[in-house]
Amino acid sequence: MNKKSYMKIGILLMVGLFICAGCSAQQGGKYTVEDLDNLAEIKIYSAENNELIKTISDEEQLYQYNQCSLYDDSDTEEHQHKLEKDLEGAKEQYYMISYKYPVARFGGEELVENTTITLYEDKNIIKMTVSGESIKGFSVPEEFLVFYYEVSEEEMNFYHSLVEW
């Protein structure tokens, strides 16, 4: 494998860690910042006019959002290109931008953009763009921060329910 493939695999692993929350939270209880993997809020925008539709900060919804399993270790560079090609001409429907609490305990308390998930009309493929500012310590070229995933109908219904909740 070449250096490019190793970098993509490394970033996919990091993204998996960003998205997956620990299983230690108990249902019905209050979630800690760690349970939510530092996720603070999600803003949902219409892709048609970039209008803010909704801001989600409810802990239960944030926890469920974190539980969506986007990472598929069978994804290869070729599969990513196939999914990207499958989206050609597809109409973007919503942007879901997730924000996390800053890692530093001191200093700015401004939320940090983490990922943007793009939903498409009549497609079970989503595009996830990792924000460059969410990766500390080194710069990653933008082309390595965009991932495509086929999601189940159940997961797609969940994403759409966030818009309607």
Residue spans of the language-model regions?
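Residue-level signal for mature regions of secreted extracellular proteins and peptides
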Residues: 13-17
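C-terminal motif of bacterial Sec signal peptides marking the signal peptidase cleavage site
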Residues: 19-22
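Inter-domain helical "communication" segments and dimerization helices
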Residues: 10-12, 78
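Function-determining sites in protein domains
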Residues: 5, 24-165
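Bacterial N-terminal signal peptides that target proteins for export
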Residues: 2-10
